C-alpha cells in the first residue's frame, strides 16, 4: 500500500481486488461454513425455588405454580451458516465470473438475526486485437433483518420465575393474551410474549 499511496498510506489502506474469470472451460467452486454463538455469562437471578423460599407473599397468590428460567426462554444458540458459490470461465475473447454469497445469521435472542444474499457478475471483453479491454461489473444485495426486542432481556431478569410462559387452553385469559401468561401490572410484560409477538424488522436491497 505504501508503494502505491506513499505517506497517505500511514493511516492504513484497504485494497480491494475484483476477481475476473479465468480463460478456458467453466469452473465452479463452493465453500461454506457454520458457526454458533452462545452467551458466556448471564446475570444471576432468583430461580423459582429461591423465589418461593424468600417471598413473604408466596401464599397470597405470588406463586403461579410453574418453574421458568426466563433467560433461557428468550435466548438461543446463535447459529450462522454461510455459502459461497462462483462460476468462471471464458467464451472466445469474453471472460466471465459470477459469484453468489448467502448468509443466514441467527442471534442469541429469539426472533433476532438476518438473511442476506449477495450477487456479483464480472465480464471482460477483449477488442481491437487485444489492445482494448472492456470490463463490466454488476453487484446486488438483498437483506432481511429481524432486530428482536432487547427489552425482553430486561423483563427476563425481572419476571416471576413461578409464572408459566403460556396459559392452559382452558384458562379464561388464554384468548385475551394470545395464549401467553400475563400479569396485569404496569411495565411488567411476559418476556417471551414480547419477543415472539413483537414485529421489529427491516430490509434493504441494492
Q: What residue spans do the PLM features occupy?
A:
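Residue-level signature of outer-membrane beta-barrel architecture
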Residues: 18-20, 89-91, 102, 121, ...
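Outer-membrane beta-barrel transmembrane strands
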Residues: 76-94, 101-104, 117, 191-206
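Glycine-rich, phosphate-binding/catalytic loops in enzymes
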Residues: 10-14, 47-48, 115-116
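A beta-strand signature from Gram-negative outer-membrane beta-barrel systems
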Residues: 1-29, 80-82, 95, 101-106
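Surface-exposed loop/interface segments of Gram-negative outer-membrane beta-barrel transport/assembly proteins
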Residues: 22-67, 108-109, 118-205
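Conserved short hydrophobic patches within well-ordered secondary structure
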Residues: 12-16, 98, 119-121, 204-206
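C-terminal beta-signal and adjacent terminal beta-strands/loops
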Residues: 72-74
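Short, glycine-/polar-rich solvent-exposed loops and beta-turns at beta-strand/coil boundaries
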Residues: 6-10, 76, 112-115, 150
Amino acid at each position: 500500500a505504501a508503494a502505491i499511496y506513499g505517506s497517505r498510506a500511514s493511516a492504513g489502506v484497504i485494497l480491494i481486488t475484483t476477481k475476473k474469470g479465468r480463460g478456458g472451460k467453466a469452473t465452479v467452486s463452493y465453500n461454506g461454513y457454520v458457526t454458533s454463538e452462545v452467551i458466556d455469562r448471564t446475570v444471576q437471578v432468583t430461580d423459582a425455588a429461591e423465589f418461593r423460599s424468600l417471598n413473604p407473599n408466596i401464599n397470597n397468590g405470588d406463586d403461579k405454580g410453574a418453574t421458568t428460567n426466563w433467560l433461557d426462554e428468550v435466548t438461543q444458540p446463535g447459529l450462522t451458516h454461510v455459502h459461497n458459490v462462483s462460476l468462471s470461465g471464458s467464451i472466445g475473447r469474453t471472460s466471465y465470473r459470477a459469484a453468489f454469497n448467502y448468509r443466514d445469521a441467527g442471534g442469541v435472542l429469539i426472533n433476532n438475526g438476518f438473511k442476506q444474499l449477495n450477487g456479483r457478475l464480472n465480464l471482460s471483453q477483449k477488442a481491437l486485437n487485444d489492445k482494448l479491454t472492456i470490463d463490466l461489473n454488476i453487484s446486488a444485495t438483498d437483506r432481511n433483518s429481524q432486530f428482536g426486542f432487547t427489552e425482553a432481556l430486561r423483563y427476563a431478569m425481572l419476571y416471576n420465575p413461578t409464572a408459566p410462559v403460556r396459559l392452559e387452553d382452558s384458562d379464561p385469559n388464554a384468548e385475551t393474551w394470545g395464549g401467553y401468561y400475563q400479569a396485569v401490572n404496569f411495565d411488567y410484560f411476559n418476556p417471551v410474549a414480547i419477543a415472539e409477538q413483537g414485529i421489529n424488522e427491516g430490509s434493504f436491497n441494492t
